Every structure is written in C-alpha cells, then in structure tokens.
Amino acid sequence: MGIAGNEWGFQVGTLPKGTRDKISDVPGVTVGHCTLADGVVQTGVTALLPHQGDIFHEKVLAASYVINGFGKTTGLVQIDELGTLETPILFTNTLSVGTAQNALVKYMLEKNPDICETTGSVNPVVCECNDCGLNDIRGLHVTEQHVFAALADCKADFAEGAVGAGRGMRCHGLKGGIGSASRVVELDGKPYTMGALVLSNHALFDDLIVAGTPIHTLLNNSIPPHEDKGSIITVLATDIPLSERQLRRLCRRALVGLSRTGSYCGNGSGEIVIAFTTANRVPHYSEKALLPMTLLHDDAINPLFRAVAECVEESVLSSLLHAETVTGNHGQTFRSLTELLKNRA
C-alpha cells in the first residue's frame, strides 16, 4: 500500500514499486495482526511469515543490525552467529515479549515434533516497542491466544497503521504503527523485489520530513512537546540471492531511510533491523556437507541499497498516513497525520 495515491502528492524515490507496495510483494511473505483496542488497552501483536513452507526445516539466510540498542528484541544473537532465521518474526509491546516468545515456541513445537526430541532447540524472534503512552502496558493484556490469532491472520494483503503491534505506537509525536513498502530491482534482465516493514514508535514531530517537506511548515496544529524515546523495528525481505554478509550490509542502509524522515536515532530509541532473503534457504537436515548457492556480485549491490533506503523511508511515512487518531491510557491522544493534513487551515 505504501503512500501511493495520497492526495497531497507525496512521493518517495524513483524506483518502481511492487504490485501492493508492501513487503508481501516478496513472494511467500505474509503478515497478520491481532489488535486490542478497548479503552486503556491499545496494543496488539503482528506476525510475519518469511515463506509459506516449514521455516524451521527450510531456514532462510538472515542478518541483523543494531543502530541503537535501547531494545529487548530476542533471537538476534543466533541470527548473527548462524546467519539464518528459523521462525516467524513477531512484533508486540515491550512487556509482552515473554508472552509472545512462549507462544511462538509452542507454535513451533506443534509444527515440528522433532524440536528438542531428535534435534536441537529453536530460536524465536520477537521484536518490541514500548506503547505505554497509549496502552496500559503494565496490565499485560497480550495473551498467547492473541499471538496465535496474529499468526493465523497472516496474508499478503495486510492492513497498515494503528493495527496489531502498532496499535499503541507514537511516531514523530503522531500516531504511528505498522508501515510497509516495496521496490522492484532488475538484475540480469530479471525483476526482483525488495520489501520493508516497520513498527514505528520514535522521533520528534518538529523533525518530521515527509517526502522532502518539513511537515511542521504545512501544519498549524500544535503537537505537545515530547521526548525522543521509543523505538523503530525494521524488517527487510527480498527474493534476491544474497549472503548473510550482504544482508547485513542492507540492514545498515535502513538508517538512510530513517534519516530521510527526520530521525537522528536518539539515546532512548531502539533501532533494530533484521533482513532475510527467501532465495537462499538452508535445510535443517542435509545429506550433503556442501550446499550450492547463488550469490549477487557485490558490484551489483548499489540498486539494492537505494531500494532499502526508499522502502524504509516510505514505510515510516505509510505507518503515519494510514494510522487514525487514537485515545487510550490516561486519556492520552496521538493524532493522525492524515487527519491533521486534511484539517489544516
């Protein structure tokens, strides 16, 4: 969905977009939500499936990068050591990471009876942002059933904005949440896709830049002063055959997209990036010691860097433009950028 067709003419980048302009333009990638929206409870769970097969037995090459480590994401140590992803990726609020991890382990055990019986354990990946501004986070309202519901909801045409894990998030002082975008890159005459998904909960209103325009110059509305703390989680997916080293290089370029929207990655903000490719899969069991893989030549990687920057920038803006105004805990309200733009004098 991205920000295509917005009524203000905002455009990001020059590369062609995917059909949906979402991370799900990468074949096999799907996303699902479970949203809790009831008074002081404004939170939820978002799940991302890297492909439609058995992710434990068909792992995907992956990498991570920590821009600023004020965060509690689980599973990154093994991703960085082994270079693979073997579970869906979950997103939720900070204090629900434990619940989400337990649920994800149960989900994987049900699908893979060999785990901790005839083979080793599993590495659940759970990402988080702190939604305590809108959500009664101390109430621990997310349950394992909510996680299972998000996993069951995974589909290519998923919602963006104040949904799932994004329900209680604030981005640049406005209502943030889930955002996504994609770009198409041609290599050796064949089209490939780069996609991004963000959970945005970071940065300052006065710094917000929308497609090159400082947004405070368009709005007369006063946004209450706030600290630059929170987090943003970024996941990159592609069907381009890459190594884990190359995926880590892509992760580092996410910062380019974040900076284009005005973020400087403050002290209290956790900027975590995970990237994976569906092209190179690693079987959990293999009769052969050597595995054949196709890899991109590094001299051809620049268009991918551009695609990452554009996808991440647009994903942040998409999370803002698709989110409605939400009032939650302690009567706090985070306002919708779209509504503010429509109502501006």
Regions found by a protein language model. Name each.
Residues 1-345:
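Alpha/propeptide regions of enzymes that mature by internal proteolysis
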